[in-house]
């Protein structure tokens, strides 16, 4: 069972619909008991870093989530701000992140040479894979995904980065450490490439 984590933020039904079309059992989960029945977890996230961390803490499931991911090694996929909270901290706020992947979330800060670029980045962008990874199997070369964000993760360990995109310079847009995965882009909004990526995650 794939659990789509409902902690008050994120586009939950879009993930559920894609997974249903792919014939993967899934449910939107809110409670500890529901979460414990999951074999994989998707963490959507929309909003600010601090508000998402607050929502996760207020939900009462943070400790169980950490146990499932860090001790029982259940695969987890963080999306957009759901990926950012995998990091240790963010320039956007003062809260600590989950710290499952060491790094800091930074804001796009363009000089005059990139003055035509807007923040947030909204729309489609090519993604370049750095290394072979189960999450990115069978995607077309330089696939395009949908982005909507002002911040990006800067990892301390290069090996945690599996893909980057270019927006005024290269930035990390997908990460993986052991059973922990993250995408800055929105696979649930990215048509066939997003469907392929979610199929890969669901098949782990």
From Swiss-Prot:
Q: Does the keyword Cytoplasm apply?
A: yes
The Gene Ontology biological process annotation of the record reads: L-histidine biosynthetic process
One GO CC annotation:
cytoplasm
- What residues form the catalytic site here? 80, 186, 188
The reaction(s) this protein catalyses = 5-[(5-phospho-1-deoxy-D-ribulos-1-ylimino)methylamino]-1-(5-phospho-beta-D-ribosyl)imidazole-4-carboxamide + L-glutamine = D-erythro-1-(imidazol-4-yl)glycerol 3-phosphate + 5-amino-1-(5-phospho-beta-D-ribosyl)imidazole-4-carboxamide + L-glutamate + H(+); L-glutamine + H2O = L-glutamate + NH4(+)
Q: What is its EC number?
A: 4.3.2.10, 3.5.1.2
Family matches, as InterPro entries: Class_I_gatase-like, GATASE, Imidazole-glycPsynth_HisH
Q: Name one Pfam family in it.
A: GATase
The biological pathway it contributes to is:
Amino-acid biosynthesis; L-histidine biosynthesis; L-histidine from 5-phospho-alpha-D-ribose 1-diphosphate: step 5/9
Question: Residue limits of the Glutamine amidotransferase type-1 domain?
Answer: 1-204
* Record flagged with keyword Transferase: no
MF terms (GO), sorted A to Z: glutaminase activity; imidazoleglycerol-phosphate synthase activity; lyase activity
Quick one: where is this thing mainly located? cytoplasm
In which compartments does the protein localize? Cytoplasm
Keywords attached to this entry: Amino-acid biosynthesis, Cytoplasm, Glutamine amidotransferase, Histidine biosynthesis, Hydrolase, Lyase
Assembly description? Heterodimer of HisH and HisF.
Report the HAMAP family cross-referenced here. HisH
Q: Which PANTHER family match?
A: IMIDAZOLE GLYCEROL PHOSPHATE SYNTHASE SUBUNIT HISH
| Cited function | IGPS catalyzes the conversion of PRFAR and glutamine to IGP, AICAR and glutamate. The HisH subunit catalyzes the hydrolysis of glutamine to glutamate and ammonia as part of the synthesis of IGP and AICAR. The resulting ammonia molecule is channeled to the active site of HisF.
Name of this protein: Imidazole glycerol phosphate synthase subunit HisH
Lineage runs: Bacteria, Pseudomonadati, Spirochaetota, Spirochaetia, Leptospirales
